[in-house]
């Protein structure tokens, strides 16, 4: 039987980490929220906030050793993963495990694991370490294609390229936006898909793997814009998606919730990416499911039962993006947004913003997916983001 309270350390304290922290507090856990900047969203609901450079091996290792949490929960990719491997050897539980965290932060490693080791269908791809290699690989992959940094997150540094004339610009952007010292890009065939989905996959300590109903989503520049649930798939499509998700997560090992992304093209199910943590497209589960993805993640981590996962209503989400950069932020239109029946607004509480930064999300239920998506879109459009002093004048 699990003894509470547990101490959870979040590595990354953004909006997803905030919901993990809230789920943890509801179970009586102590939450330590870490990030590179003050007043990050999860810090606002945690017992303790720590600002540090999580890419610094010694700093990250010392922080974990000093506080000795029961569980370390990475929420972002930008981490000194070698430090996590050392900590894991000392008996501290890293979720899902240090190896999975390392593999999934690098597009080349997770792609090689899926396509080469596990023989899973993916887009055609190749790698380049300089502009000349990029030009050569592009000839083999064929246009249109995508150029992405091997290490980045939230679509940063991605370009859709239709011909060779834009390759140098794509290279420059990818290297500029790459995380860490990586100077490598992945070149991917552009899949003319019918649909993109996320299959939230939960690996439990009892060795069972369970799934949430599929989530449909749209991205722009590789970054989530809206999502909806449940997304209908054929019997064969869902069976294949579950089979692939289970195969990849079994290879990675560990416990917790994984966000596994797929392209759907006709009856084809094509593996895209994987995150070993709650997924941004899964924010819709805060209104669509009996247990949201953050609660499911923690139940799996802490060895707690998950009797069932049910979709309670057709539901949708739409991100609320800032159009400008502000040192301090204020909002208008929340009253208008909340006039929409069966809708919610979540403001993440980020202390400042820049153009295109995700500052909140609207959530809505409907009798149909179409109604839910319409309401979520309408609600999000109500929210205006201002510089704080301007909004308060």
Curated annotation (Swiss-Prot):
Q: Which residues are recorded as binding Mg(2+)?
A: 261, 273
SUPFAM superfamilies linked to this entry: Glutathione synthetase ATP-binding domain-like (SSF56059), PreATP-grasp domain (SSF52440)
The record's GO molecular-function terms, alphabetically, read: ATP binding; magnesium ion binding; phosphoribosylglycinamide formyltransferase 2 activity; phosphoribosylglycinamide formyltransferase activity
Under the heading PROSITE patterns, the entry gives: ATP_GRASP
Into which family does the record put it? Belongs to the PurK/PurT family.
Q: Spell out the subunit comment.
A: Homodimer.
What the protein does comes down to: Involved in the de novo purine biosynthesis. Catalyzes the transfer of formate to 5-phospho-ribosyl-glycinamide (GAR), producing 5-phospho-ribosyl-N-formylglycinamide (FGAR). Formate is provided by PurU via hydrolysis of 10-formyl-tetrahydrofolate.
Name by which UniProt lists this protein: Formate-dependent phosphoribosylglycinamide formyltransferase
